[in-house]
Amino acid sequence: MKAKLNRAFTVLTGWMGRAREFVSRISGWEPAPLMGLAVVAYAGVLAADWCFHDAANVARLICFSAFQVREFVWFLSFWLLGVLLVRGLPWSMGGAVFVGAFLMHCERHCFSKGHEFARSLPTEEPVVCRVTGEVRGVPQLLGERGKAAGCRFRLWVSCVEGCPKGAATGFQMLVHWNGAAPGCGDVLRFRAQVRRIAGPRNPFQFDAASFYMREGVWAEALVLNGLNAEVLSLGDWIRFPVLVERVRSVLCEHLRIGLEDRVQTHSLLSSMMFGVHGDSLMEVREYFRDTGTLHLFAVSGLNMTMLGAMLAAALRLAGARGRFLELVVFLVVVLYAIATGMGASSLRAILMGCLVLVGRWISRPALLINSLGAAALISIVEDTNAVFRIGFQLSFGLVLGLALFGRPVASVIASLVTPDELVPRPLWKDWQWRRIRVWKPVAVAMAASIGSWISVLPWSVFLMHQITPIAMLVNLVVVPMAFVNLALGFASLLCAPFLALEHHALSGVAPLRGIVTRLNAGNGWIVDRLMSVVKGASEVPYGNVWIGYPFRKRPDFLVFDVGDGGAVLLNDGRESWLLDCGSVVFANSVVVPAMQGYGVGTIAGLILSHGDSAHLGGIDLLHNRIRIRSVLHSALKDRSPVWRKFEQRRVIDGNPVMPVVAGDVLATGEVSHLEVLYPPDGLRAALADDKCLVLRWRTKFGSVLYTADSGFTAERWLLEHRRSSLKSDVWVRGVHESDLSGTDDFVNAIEPRLIVVSDTRRRFSSPGIDEWVRRWRDAGLRVWTQRECGAVEGFVEKDGLRCVGFLRENCLLPLRPLK
């Protein structure tokens, strides 16, 4: 046995040696010990998070036979990668770093006071508590500009009275405040509804609970009336977050000079300079995401390099040299990073710059990979949760990818114009040398663009669920334009201190405002051109392709949990249909992300049941994000202003809305059959809910009946005229605004094997609905309320139809003959 282990260890060591040689040969850099330690620490944090996220995982860890192979291979891969990058690293050192990162993450995250407090709260209903604490950071105002809609801030809790396990203290809490925003450092006491931060209820929905959990926030408090809160003490007038926010606001206002009437241009410029994301950018953000240029919104090392280069040039003109120049430039860059919020990319650039600077002062040039590893290791020690944040992963992954792929790609591109290697260099012609000199910067730029695209490809696939080939070309244009934007922006900001003297009416300063105006105006012109390039590139066919999540099967039907509204996605393997799209909020946060996650970029038809804003409010947003071949709506008159506006838009586009009535068949074939059962042509009804489309989707595995918010009027007509067409396996129903729905005769005619009550927020508290659900459950029917199970997915299996609730519930409906 010992001989076999020694032989296996020898083989593994040989493989690792050959892997080291391969990495060094293709990338041109030697293995770096600090990068290896950073990767080993990363593995330790991942292991701690996985083991203690669920108690069942601890049992798997103790009982190795039940240990999941996938997680074991994942941790082992990180361990071997760390050892691969470190030449001559003792196994004991790697083990110490692994164990240290493991224990550090357990102490800071898994066993934190905030985690313990959140676990003491009930999972369903909030708890009314009396909270005392200090406001941390600057409160974030909510709502549209100029309209007071409360704020959101983080509170360092000093006491919580009324929680199930007694008073709690010493953790952060997210507070939703309704009223005038408090100041940073204010000590407050208020009564609020305290609960765990809600997680997603639909596939691919943003996981707010996980996001705030990585920030050390596990619970939230809803303050309905801020007037009843008590301010125990006011914060100091000098607070670091407040000063940073004020400085950032002053500098952003300085960039507004000359751009007062161009709000979107100024917002984009402020975002590129300081990472300030205004409301006006939401309209154009999708263009940048679809072209792979969303990095322009983040403050990165490019900003700091540009600022440092400009400041160094100015100081050299003033006669500064040596370490004094380097120190001044570094301090100014650090202050700029602090003013921008010190994001992950800014922190990485500062740490790497500090290591490079110290290396120069002690005559020990720093290696790129080693410096990157040191920066990652320091970031992990400072906050172990940093490794789970997208900003950290993208920042370090991009630099690592450029270091790994940049030189090989540049060599391949440069070889396109390089003469044959067999020809001696003295024999090269002058025109060949000129071509090489001209082509070299082009090759470097193309290598940077292609290397960046390759580096972020895993995040594009697994996070954004899309591939953007157009990004390799667009970045060749927009990055130089952004470079000019930053240069003009920093030139304008360098004039800010002198421009302040204008208020004192000093001679020779007044013309400076004209210079700043021209700089900002020129910058705004370039920003507009950049926006035009990005918008045009987003419309290039196949420049952006939705591919869906690689390891997740697309459901055959999906009932979204969209609050008061409704939305159902149908898929027969060849084409997809969408029944309603929810409100504008849910369309943006639920429907579009899910369709992108499943790779559904085109739908055969969008069928709108009625004019309720909760069912069709997001139609404009959906139309801009997804290709819709046809839109279908009831032939009855609809008074919804949102619908009328969209109907006119379709007419202008040359693809008008198709009216449908009872008896129309929208999809027919061997795979699926989609039929309209209600309303009949000429029906007169006052309420929109009485004119809802009722549709039945039938396939080889079963059928789905969608009645939206139909009431007694629709059910009576269907029983009289279309009773034989009602029988379905799954019934997706809402709740009528004021009328009775779900009568016994109607349920018996459908003979459903599963009922999904899609309405869960506004009207579900009605005693009649509660009693209806309880009565049919007692009768033996499966009735799922989306308040309890969230979204519902249906998958065709060999033995029948598998219905899965996103939060809970799971059942298999055996196949039965269809009529």
Named regions from a protein language model:
Residues 2-119, 128, 230, 314-320, ...:
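Transmembrane helix-bundle segments that form internal channels/tunnels in multi-pass membrane proteins
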Residues 36, 44, 78, 86, ...:
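Hydrophobic alpha-helical transmembrane segments in multi-pass membrane proteins
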Residues 2, 178-180, 184-187, 191, ...:
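Non-globular, low-confidence helical/coil segments that flank catalytic cores
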Residues 152, 267-269, 375, 564-567, ...:
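Short glycine-rich loop/turn motifs
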Residues 148, 244, 248, 252, ...:
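Hydrophobic face of alpha-helices
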Residues 2-28, 95-295, 589-593, 602, ...:
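Membrane-interface helix/helix-cap signal primarily in integral membrane proteins
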Residues 144, 259-264, 344, 367, ...:
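Proline-centered turn/helix-capping motifs that create local helix->coil transitions or kinks
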Residues 156-162, 462, 571, 698:
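A generic structural motif
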